Amino acid sequence: MSKKQFITRWDDEQLAEANRSLAAVTGKSNLHKKDRLFPSSPFGQTAAGLEDFRGVELTETIQYLTVQGVDLSYARFVGAASLNTSTFTNCCFDRIKLDSRYVTHEFSRCSFRGAKLNNARISERFEDCDFTGSNLSKAIANDVSFIRCRFSDVNFRGAMFMHCRFEECSFEGAVFHNGSLAGSRFTGETGLLPVWGNTILDGVKINGERLV
């Protein structure tokens, strides 16, 4: 199916129910509830066994939840909705639109291929995540850990990734320019490091050695 088909398959009633169900479990006001599970999709599961929310439009922030095995590819977040202070494992956010929004807390084995994350506010830990082809221009991250993440062909123009830790990450084809990596640390194969471009590199260390 195409992006348009994933989006248009959702009718108004299905979207309203998805957001009602999410509102019942997300946020601080629902922390007292037991079994705060991410809603089930009216479309069942994908071929990969993930809960199928591809193309959904969410008006509710996914907040203070533990989410596993959900596919939110092509999802759109409207209003103030974002991914905020939650734990995501084995989730798919391919080509998701999260520009100028929060993408925070912990992400493990998640895919952000082709995602629009420009101007996003990013934290706190990403492990075994794939950002191939995503737009991270002007994104802001401070003291964030990226473990074994793939950043192939990522647009980092104007991004401010300061005091971050990149462990065994790859950056083939990634573009940095007019941003900052000040105070960040890189460990792993030096052949997998990015082309820095006109990027602030004050205090950057590679395998323990100061770069500039």
Where are these regions (language model features)?
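N-terminal, intrinsically disordered, low-complexity segments
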Residues: 2-27
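Tandem repeat scaffolds
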Residues: 4-10, 31-212
